[in-house]
């Protein structure tokens, strides 16, 4: 019911796409180790929400971590061998450790097929023809089990191989892949390897967010969304003025460099201690600037 209330809010302010970011909070088959003790969304709940959103002209887009930010899944006995850092599942939980050190080991032959199986199971619940594979903040890549391969081929080559493989696989199914652009900022020239038809989600959350990242990827031919934030995460109260300035700046960059959309973000890094409804002002700023970018 809470998610339906959000859908009503988005509809009221002409927000026509919505992504629910998932790491482990869906009831995946054969992954009860990851969601046990939590309250994961079920297939029935997601399909009901998808229908509810479509009735309000909102496209509900699946968003699933498929490279970095896989703490709960890669900490299970079943999947810990797929984690970049050996024995990371034995380290006591902390929000910082969970967020920074659970990257998929792409040198493992099982890794890509495992991710494809999760995407296949999850994507079937949505009517959207888009899929956000995320692939952001792969902090550990090349530093553990894949170090030998990274030393041979280069860390960025490992990153690109995984992203390109998933993108081509989705495109072959007539699905538009989306991914976060933070790793590409460091190597914008490598964007030529990304297949045509992929959407890059270019984020930046500062009040006076610079245009460089949006400009550089635009010059490389990227099709992109600009992605500001509501500035509520990791705090008790929202930074409302920061969100206003951030949304204004990112919308300006998007208009200047011909972005095709805006995705406003509300994260739960270090625990979402801020009340969810405190995000509403930032959500509305994004809607206002997106529809009135000039």
Where do the model's predicted regions map?
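Glycine-rich, histidine-containing beta strand-loop boundary motifs that form or position
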Residues: 19-24, 62-66, 135, 181, ...
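N-terminal structural segment of carbohydrate-active enzymes
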Residues: 1-19
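Substrate-binding groove of N-acetylhexosamine-processing glycoside hydrolases
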Residues: 48-51, 57, 109-131, 137, ...
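Sparse, context-dependent recognition of short Cys/His-centered cofactor- or disulfide-binding micro-motifs
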Residues: 3, 26, 31, 64, ...
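Generic hydrophobic, helix-prone segments enriched in Leu/Val/Ile
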Residues: 5, 21, 82, 284-287
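Aromatic- and acidic-residue-enriched carbohydrate-binding clefts of CAZyme catalytic domains
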Residues: 11-12, 19-59, 69-113, 124, ...
């Amino acid at each position: 019911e809470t998610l339906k209330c959000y859908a009503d809010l988005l509809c009221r302010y002409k927000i026509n796409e919505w992504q629910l970011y998932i790491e482990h909070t869906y009831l995946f088959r054969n992954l009860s180790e990851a969601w046990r003790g939590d309250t994961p969304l079920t297939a029935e709940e997601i399909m009901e929400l998808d229908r509810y959103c479509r009735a309000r002209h909102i496209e509900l887009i699946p968003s699933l971590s498929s490279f970095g930010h896989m703490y709960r899944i890669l900490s299970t006995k079943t999947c810990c061998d797929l984690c970049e850092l050996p024995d990371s599942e034995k380290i006591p939980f902390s929000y910082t450790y969970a967020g920074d050190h659970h990257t998929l080991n792409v040198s493992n032959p099982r890794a890509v097929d495992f991710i494809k199986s999760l995407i296949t199971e999850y994507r079937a619940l949505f009517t959207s023809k888009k899929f956000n594979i995320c692939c952001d903040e792969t902090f550990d890549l090349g530093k553990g089990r894949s170090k030998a391969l990274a030393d041979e081929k280069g860390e960025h080559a490992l990153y690109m191989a995984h992203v390109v493989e998933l993108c081509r696989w989705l495109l072959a199914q007539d699905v538009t892949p989306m991914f976060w652009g933070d790793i590409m900022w460091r190597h914008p020239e490598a964007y030529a390897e990304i297949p045509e038809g992929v959407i890059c989600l270019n984020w930046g959350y500062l009040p006076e967010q610079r245009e460089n990242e949006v400009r550089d990827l635009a010059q490389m031919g990227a099709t992109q969304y600009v992605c500001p934030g509501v500035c509520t995460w990791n705090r008790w109260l929202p930074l409302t003025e920061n969100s206003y300035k951030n949304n204004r700046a990112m919308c300006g960059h998007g208009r200047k460099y011909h972005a095709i959309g805006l995705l406003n973000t509300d994260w739960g890094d270090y625990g979402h201690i801020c009340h969810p409804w405190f995000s509403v002002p930032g959500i509305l700023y994004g809607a206002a600037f997106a529809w009135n970018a000039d």
